[in-house]
A protein has these predicted regions:
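Periplasmic OmpA-like peptidoglycan-binding domain that tethers envelope proteins to the cell wall
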Residues: 82-152
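Periplasmic peptidoglycan-binding/tethering modules of Gram-negative envelope proteins
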Residues: 1-78, 152
Length: 152
C-alpha cells in the first residue's frame, strides 16, 4: 500500500511538473485553455501552410509582419496562436502538426521582436475546420495558424 501511495504521489508530481513546463514554454494546457477568454480581432490575420508542412510560407511573412506591428503598438496584449490542420492524417499526427505550425508561427513573431511571454500556443489538429468540405480548396483553408487576443 505504501508503494502504491508513493507511486501515485510521484505520478502526480510528474504531471504537475509537466503542466508547469508547458506553461513556461507558452504552450497552453487544456486547463489554461478552458479558463482563458479569447476573442478574434480583425487586425490579426491568419496564415496558411502547405500540406504536411509547418514552415512559414513567403506569402505569410507580410501578414505576420502586420500582426507584429499591431502587437508592438499594443504592448499589453497577449495572444493565443491556434495551429490547425486539414482532415488528412491521423488525429494524433494532426495534433502534433498543428502544434508545430503554432510554434513556428510563434518563433517567427519572436524573430520580429515580439516577446515570447506574450504568445501562447495550442493545437486543435483537424478538430476545428473552417471549411468542412473534402476538397483541396477546403483543405488549404483549414491548414492555418489562427490568432486570438487573450482577454482574461
Amino acid at each position: 500500500k505504501a508503494e502504491e501511495e508513493a507511486r501515485l504521489k510521484a505520478e502526480e508530481e510528474k504531471r504537475v511538473e509537466e503542466e508547469r513546463l508547458k506553461e513556461e514554454e507558452g504552450e497552453i494546457t487544456p486547463q489554461v485553455a478552458r479558463e482563458a477568454e479569447t476573442k478574434a480581432v480583425p487586425q490579426l490575420g491568419d496564415i496558411h501552410f502547405d500540406f504536411d508542412k509547418s514552415d512559414i510560407r513567403a506569402d505569410s511573412r507580410e501578414i505576420l509582419q502586420k500582426n507584429a506591428d499591431w502587437l508592438q503598438n499594443n504592448p499589453d496584449i497577449k495572444i493565443q496562436i491556434e495551429g490547425h490542420c486539414d482532415e488528412r492524417g491521423t488525429a494524433e499526427y494532426n495534433l502534433a502538426l498543428g502544434e508545430r505550425r503554432a510554434m513556428s508561427t510563434k518563433k517567427y513573431l519572436i524573430s520580429l521582436g515580439i516577446s515570447a511571454d506574450r504568445i501562447y500556443t495550442i493545437s486543435y489538429g483537424e478538430e476545428l475546420p473552417i471549411d468542412p468540405n473534402h476538397s483541396e480548396d477546403a483543405w488549404s483553408k483549414n491548414r492555418r495558424a489562427h490568432f486570438l487576443v487573450i482577454t482574461k
